[in-house]
């Protein structure tokens, strides 16, 4: 960051930003993604993910498929659409009329999930590891079933990895061990290493809907943020680093957590 700060901090995204191109390629190389849009935060990345899902169905002539199905008491950010996506009264109370377009199901209740899918559902959006809702880990088999369900219903799968992605689980993405390929993934906290960066990753199919003018950001993808992201990627994408994250957890943190297992429900 110090090195880049002595050069160029910000320039209009009408110009090519080499640092951003490099970071996008690194993210694509280490993920399912074919296309990346940079933001400044997790909430922005989540809202962009919602836009991408809705725009995709609009682009293929199905504009009424615009509803996003989320988990009750999840957390997707603090902007107005994100709080209503979260399905939590404490998040939405006092913030005016309800933002429409979101439906909710109970974590772990597969019947509830299936019943809530309608002809207007565009995507299922879940946190791979729930944070605000109680550190609930979606099992690999469940992620695989979610992918199959989305394929069957011809809807998109959005895995929100803003909080748990980019090495924080000991894998580059928390969903990696499931071998699932989502359609859209918002990221933020892990890629910035403390600096405000966000991004939404997507596959080629949905990226075709995001033509010039459908989304943008004044500061998203600026040279300073991209330089930070590149440095983080060089460290966190290293397999030795990721293995050490797992080792530290098992050897140092797991023993201190064991007493809690006797008193609290374990969801993973």
Task: List the predicted regions and their residue ranges.
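Conserved N-terminal phosphate-binding loop of PLP-dependent enzymes in the Aspartate aminotransferase
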Residues: 1-268
